[in-house]
A protein has these predicted regions:
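Solvent-exposed beta-strand motifs enriched in subsets of small alpha/beta binding domains
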Residues: 2-8, 43-48
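Structural motif
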Residues: 4, 29-30, 68
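Helix N-cap motif at beta-to-alpha junctions
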Residues: 10-13, 48-55
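Short amphipathic alpha-helix segments
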Residues: 11-28
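Short acidic, gly/pro-rich beta-turn/loop elements at beta-sheet edges
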Residues: 16, 41, 57
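Short loop/turn and capping residues at structural boundaries
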Residues: 25, 32-33, 70-72
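Amphipathic, hydrophobic secondary-structure cores in small proteins
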Residues: 28-49
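C-terminal structural segments of small proteins and small subunits
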Residues: 51-86
Length: 86
């Protein structure tokens, strides 16, 4: 199963989103530093979660500014990220 990365503007926003996802049943939700190949604005934080959480995130992110949502695919030794924000 693929995972998603939700890029947010601060560690506080990332922590709040991860807690919301865990309360909603996604026990995989956790805060990570945004991978360097995705971080467009220097140091940022993301929430890594299960792919099933994408609709919950898009509909329940009140008060949390989301920069982008990516799906992570692992091909061999490499990780590829696809923007699914829209």
């Amino acid at each position: 199963m693929a995972e998603i990365l939700v890029e947010v503007g601060s560690i506080t926003s990332a922590t709040r989103l991860a807690k919301r996802l865990k309360r909603a049943g996604d026990q995989k939700a956790r805060v990570i530093s945004t991978p360097s190949e995705l971080g467009k604005s220097g140091c940022s934080y993301s929430v890594k979660a299960s792919e099933e959480s994408v609709n919950f995130i898009k509909n329940n992110h009140q008060g949390i500014s989301i920069k982008a949502i990516y799906i992570e695919k692992i091909k061999g030794e490499e990780r590829e990220y696809y923007d699914i924000s829209r």
